[in-house]
């Protein structure tokens, strides 16, 4: 802090206290509790004033300069905290823990928790239908000898969902995989090792936190995690052979412990997430398919926007996780599909969805209970959720059988009622509790005898005061007399100043107002002491009982977490069933054998956005027909056709029904898309460079089990360069990689490849022309397109007629010119064994580089020259 002096003696005692606390949190905003406000000082105040648009004032002086100060009301702090967290700031909450009445100096204060973007659990600070993750990464170039390697994996990554307790590690093999993971997780906060070699991988991420190298120590991480999970080794979690992932997990967990300053009982395990368990989606594919975010950064017109009709927030979050991590496990996928079928067949959608809506967000409520930050209404919501479970079980009974393959039975078993916990919460919490415990009125009557006695004494004050007022009116004859109370002066008897002349001698003046006088009697004073003492004891006891309630719920934590997971999964599968019926989806057949066969497939999003009937189209990719060259006019539907194929394949790999009349989907290992591009100005890359980078990633990483979508490869450069690149890419994918490929192009020359490569076929989207008007048919047909209709599309776009006319003239001239054949000789498979985007050196060049001409005789030099000439 630039404005604080090292010598604290010149400051007031309170400011010395503040500066001491601030020194522990130099990079964190301090919310310093003073009465009914949280105050910020010095640079914190200036920063908060700018970010929150609050007034910047001053308090006292230091070194002759006024101390900047800004503050927010205690009761409205959550709104300001939410804004700061959304902006990536961390805030330390410093509370008064001492009693102002007994404090000789400043009231004792301490930081009770640190709120960071990735560790928040408060309901008001979270988006309810979106995961909020904190991630830690380390690379294999760490100075730590146990982490430093020259081979894959290249990175260790761990992530934690504080609001659910999900703790996961993985080890990305390459920088591309790391970027894909970060895009999938979209962390609110990212911890990274100070030794990270390539900062450009994360520099555009928000919530960056640089951590010292020692926090990634492997031995410390293992010890820390064993202690948390109460184990002697981590073998049972399947992570003991993941040193980089464990190092990242250790750093992350220590950071969370330091910020939360409390036990973390809801973090009960760590899971290893392996890429080979799922369908790999790189960053470009996630973006191009618009899974949860559209190309403009919004949420509209995405796959999630169409599918997510979940009844609970936790179901919505799980659905999005499934979209970003499609699986290759046929057992899991068939379980999901069969459960969707059961829900439809048993007509469970209508009765189940209203019950699910009443369950709320059990997952995050349980997390807040584990962290000790749950509010009274969290307990009330949990109670309400538990009260719905018996009826939910009754509805599921029709789907329960003894068959071990009935996954619906498994879900039902994991969501059994919890009558004891339900009974505890019914007994302990009033029907409609207040927001906070501080004002009391949370614990239900009958829960604790001592509390009931104090409550009766406190509540009886009103009746006593009414009786006293009536007696005093009769005794004094002053009928305007009133008995009242306020927090400053306590109980009093109030009357007009005129009437006060005739008060009895036992009336003691307590306060004089402009028109009234206030008095107290010995009887009223004794009652005041008794009532205030009862109220104080009542509040203290109620807070104590409330804290004990946390401890009583904790033994059920594991079952509650299992319950929340089961309910979330049931919610997603019920949503899949509802969407299947509402949108006319079918159950795809998932098979091990490679291939994609789709009858009358439709685009999930586009068919919901268009007012016209969507034209359904087939897709057939087999071992004998691995690549489709797709031609046709702009706006003809090529990109839509390719995207809908990828989305149908992806939906099948999350266990969802698909928009088609029939579909058989073989398991794929990766989905790649190279569709559309724009300049990456932040990295200084042109559109063509972005296109080639994405293409290179596909050519290096696709396999014969991958689905590849390529749209207009080579369009960003000259015609011949672009055509040559497109041609070579198509040949490599067809002959060497042998991936299932949809290759859209305007280079009609590529259709000639079908005559050379037996596994390649041409399809096209046609259009009809009538009187210079064009009608797009949007129907996929076998064979190559007859023309591109580029001029007609330009005319539709409003290009001036004079330009269109001149273009037609020039087109006619070009078509009449003699164009030499560009069809090369058939290529052999082994031509791609050493394919690289770097130019290969000719053997002549290699020989010349390796030859020392000073050592050659004239005869040897002449022989070498003849030899080199023969190689040309």
UniProtKB/Swiss-Prot annotation:
Family annotation (InterPro entries): DNA_mismatch_repair_MutS, DNA_mismatch_repair_MutS-lik_N, DNA_mismatch_repair_MutS/MSH, DNA_mismatch_repair_MutS_C, DNA_mismatch_repair_MutS_clamp, DNA_mismatch_repair_MutS_core, DNA_mismatch_repair_MutS_N, DNA_mismatch_repair_MutS_sf
PROSITE patterns: DNA_MISMATCH_REPAIR_2
Keywords: ATP-binding, DNA damage, DNA repair, DNA-binding, Nucleotide-binding
Gene Ontology terms for molecular function: ATP binding; ATP-dependent DNA damage sensor activity; damaged DNA binding; mismatched DNA binding
GO cellular component, one term: cytosol
Residues in the signal sequence: none
Swiss-Prot/TrEMBL GO biological process terms: mismatch repair
SMART domains the record matches: MUTSac, MUTSd
Residues holding ATP: 632-639
PANTHER family assigned: DNA MISMATCH REPAIR PROTEIN MSH1, MITOCHONDRIAL, DNA MISMATCH REPAIR PROTEIN MUTS FAMILY MEMBER
Function: This protein is involved in the repair of mismatches in DNA. It is possible that it carries out the mismatch recognition step. This protein has a weak ATPase activity.
Family: Belongs to the DNA mismatch repair MutS family.
UniProt-recorded name of the protein: DNA mismatch repair protein MutS
The species this protein was found in: Colwellia psychrerythraea (strain 34H / ATCC BAA-681) (Vibrio psychroerythus)
Lineage of producing organism: Bacteria, Pseudomonadati, Pseudomonadota, Gammaproteobacteria, Alteromonadales
